């Protein structure tokens, strides 16, 4: 019996030692690849990302902050308007463009310039470039109406009632004094897009019911410039382009009188080479230009420019291409030849997509 217990104890000891040795071998020779893979998985899924602190770098003295703000739109913006005026001066000095950029400061020009004596402002009217809104601003400033919203639409263009005197109504001495000392501005847009707007407004829609455009001016253009005399349609944009591009257009202009203000050049309207304007605004950037003009004129605390509908000032090349579709290159080139001064004076790109 005693021997049986000794044998059982010996077997138990052998089994115990075998288990210890097996555990030791397992711990010592585990597959490193399996372990490292498991650890990598845990690191990617459970460990938060630890970001290194930025290393301190040596900053050259001239690049260290000075406390001054970087240029923003309030500082950059005046440079845009200075560049516009400089471009006008350069084009005005170009003898090759003299016939397209210069015009006498005649009564026709002085009739286009409206006066706000109270705030010493002169505004040259360039129709089809949002001029109705600028007239409203000046009417309020002159005190004829307390707010823009209260001005009846029929009064805006009635110069006997709207309280806006024309510069031509003053004596020569008073005209010169105002031209030299007042804040002067006008607005431009792409010349060809303006012509499209004029054609639509006066010959297609005619929202102000001005029947003379359709019943007097349109027939005169058709008689002179329509190639197919048997065609009975009303005036087409092609007829309008031929009229405007004709070097001998002036004899018709004389018959049409002041109605031509809606399509003659900016040069003919405002004489930018003869009159030193303070600011030239662009229809395409009116959202920025309108507040800037009000500020420069010192009236931004008195009146605001009416809200501009989204997208209305954006240049629409597709529309331009549509209207000029089917018109001969010869007629388009003649049109550009007349308006080349406007394109160059105000920095508008030559419309090669129509000319070539």
UniProtKB/Swiss-Prot annotation:
It is a single-pass type II membrane protein. 3'-phosphoadenylyl sulfate binds at residues 127-133, 189-197. The chain crosses the membrane at residues 7-27. One of its GO terms (cellular component) is Golgi membrane. GO terms for molecular function: sulfotransferase activity. Residues 28-356 are lumenal. Its EC number is 2.8.2.-. Disulfide bonds: none annotated. Keywords: Carbohydrate metabolism, Glycoprotein, Golgi apparatus, Lipid metabolism, Membrane, Signal-anchor, Steroid metabolism, Transferase, Transmembrane, Transmembrane helix. Pathway: Steroid metabolism; Protein modification; carbohydrate sulfation. Residues 1-6 are cytoplasmic. It catalyses: 3-O-{beta-D-GlcA-(1->[3)-alpha-D-Xyl-(1->3)-beta-D-GlcA-(1->](n)-4)-beta-D-Xyl-(1->4)-Rib-ol-P-Rib-ol-P-3-beta-D-GalNAc-(1->3)-beta-D-GlcNAc-(1->4)-O-6-P-alpha-D-Man}-L-Thr-[protein] + 3'-phosphoadenylyl sulfate = 3-O-{O-3-S-beta-D-GlcA-(1->[3)-alpha-D-Xyl-(1->3)-beta-D-GlcA-(1->](n)-4)-beta-D-Xyl-(1->4)-Rib-ol-P-Rib-ol-P-3-beta-D-GalNAc-(1->3)-beta-D-GlcNAc-(1->4)-O-6-P-alpha-D-Man}-L-Thr-[protein] + adenosine 3',5'-bisphosphate + H(+); 17beta-estradiol 3-O-(beta-D-glucuronate) + 3'-phosphoadenylyl sulfate = 17beta-estradiol 3-O-(3-sulfo-beta-D-glucuronate) + adenosine 3',5'-bisphosphate + H(+); 17beta-estradiol 3-O-(beta-D-glucuronate) 17-sulfate + 3'-phosphoadenylyl sulfate = 17beta-estradiol 3-O-(3-sulfo-beta-D-glucuronate) 17-sulfate + adenosine 3',5'-bisphosphate + H(+); 17beta-estradiol 17-O-(beta-D-glucuronate) + 3'-phosphoadenylyl sulfate = 17beta-estradiol 17-O-(3-sulfo-beta-D-glucuronate) + adenosine 3',5'-bisphosphate + H(+). It is found in: Golgi apparatus membrane. One of its GO terms (biological process) is learning. Glycans are attached at residues 99, 228, 316. The keyword DNA damage does not apply. Signal peptide: none annotated. It comes from the Eukaryota. Catalyzes the transfer of sulfate from 3'-phosphoadenylyl sulfate (PAPS) to position 3 of terminal glucuronic acid of both protein- and lipid-linked oligosaccharides. Participates in biosynthesis of HNK-1 carbohydrate structure 3-O-sulfo-beta-D-GlcA-(1->3)-beta-D-Gal-(1->4)-D-GlcNAc-R, a sulfated glucuronyl-lactosaminyl residue carried by many neural recognition molecules, which is involved in cell interactions during ontogenetic development and in synaptic plasticity in the adult. May be indirectly involved in synapse plasticity of the hippocampus, via its role in HNK-1 biosynthesis. Belongs to the sulfotransferase 2 family. This is Carbohydrate sulfotransferase 10. It comes from Pongo abelii.
